[in-house]
């Protein structure tokens, strides 16, 4: 875990209630796939945990949903603002277990961690397939970014407005894959778990300190 001050480079709306914040700072080396950061926000006692969407030297990308007063305040932050950030939180994914054709599944707020994971797997010569699950067309985000990686990207919407009608498990049918990584709401993860032989799963959850000291 590291503590550093980052500067906002951009903070833009992607979909209703979904924003992408790009930060500039030095402590990005430990922002590996599946890990998260915590941001100290003005006038709020508890830091806000946000999963890492992308990270490279000197730049950190976070994609977040406005689910309360803290994230609603974040959505109003402008370029140039400086934020105190704790990086390197969480265990992250074990990429060595992926095999050649890993399957990456993200549902709603669980989509962002799959992006950095996909990039790192591709860099290792792997050929991931990505399934992104949403309720309806207007909620879709980051589809173009995944497709730009040159990998198979499947969209599933509960109402059938785009892609496969139904849930991510419906989109899994008939796919060949060696291992599974998934992030999203608990009902989705339970359904995926019941459909695969082996995998790693990240839960969306509220938390206090972010590193276990508060036992929350």
Predicted regions and their residues:
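Short cysteine clusters
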Residues: 209, 214
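Ferredoxin-reductase
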Residues: 2-81
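FNR/FR-type flavoprotein reductase catalytic core
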Residues: 69-206
């Amino acid at each position: 875990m590291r503590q550093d001050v980052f500067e906002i480079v951009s903070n833009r709306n992607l979909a209703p209630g979904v924003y992408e914040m790009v930060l500039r700072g030095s402590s990005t080396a430990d922002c590996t796939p599946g890990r998260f950061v915590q941001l100290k926000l003005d006038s709020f006692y508890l830091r806000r945990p946000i999963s890492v969407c992308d990270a490279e030297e000197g730049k950190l990308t976070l994609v977040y949903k406005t689910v309360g007063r803290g994230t609603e305040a974040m959505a109003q932050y402008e370029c140039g603002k400086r934020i105190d950030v704790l990086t390197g939180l969480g265990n992250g994914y074990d990429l060595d277990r992926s095999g050649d054709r890993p399957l990456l599944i993200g549902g709603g707020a669980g989509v962002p961690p799959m992006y950095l994971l996909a990039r790192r797997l591709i860099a290792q010569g792997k050929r991931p397939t990505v399934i992104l699950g949403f309720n309806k067309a207007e909620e879709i985000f980051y589809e173009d970014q995944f497709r730009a990686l040159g990998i198979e990207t499947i969209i599933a919407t509960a109402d059938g407005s785009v892609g496969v009608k139904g849930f991510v498990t419906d989109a899994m049918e008939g796919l060949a894959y060696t291992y599974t990584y998934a992030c999203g709401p608990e009902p989705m993860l339970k359904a995926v778990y019941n459909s695969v032989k082996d995998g790693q799963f990240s839960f969306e959850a509220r938390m206090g300190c972010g590193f276990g000291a508060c036992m929350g």
